[in-house]
């Protein structure tokens, strides 16, 4: 579902929410995700009403067992940029997890893209109130690793000391 949506979106950002099953202590299996496809080449803004309805339908399908099946967090694509959260993404997630109406003890953000070889590449971060983001590990279907996206680091050569500096 995700790969097909990423292919269809091409160079436009898309996103949605992640619905998951808790399969162990701190371990979750994403069992469904919503897809909103109206982003641009450099921006995605989620529609809260669409995703709230998706989570309500998810709870109904799973028998209203929120201790096992629940909203895990958000996802969106960065087809034209590294699949890492921007500063705005991080701030938005921190604001979400600290929103008292949200009532979550933690949320995740997955940023994903299709790489040139059509494989998934991305990152996932966890957010908790009053704490900084923590990077997690993504696994794909059949427990395959999704290629990790790394932040580019620019190394600047040291300035040479001259006689007049």
Feature-to-residue mapping (PLM):
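MPN/JAMM (Mov34/JAB) isopeptidase/deubiquitinase module and associated MPN-bearing subunits/adaptors
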Residues: 1-73, 77-165
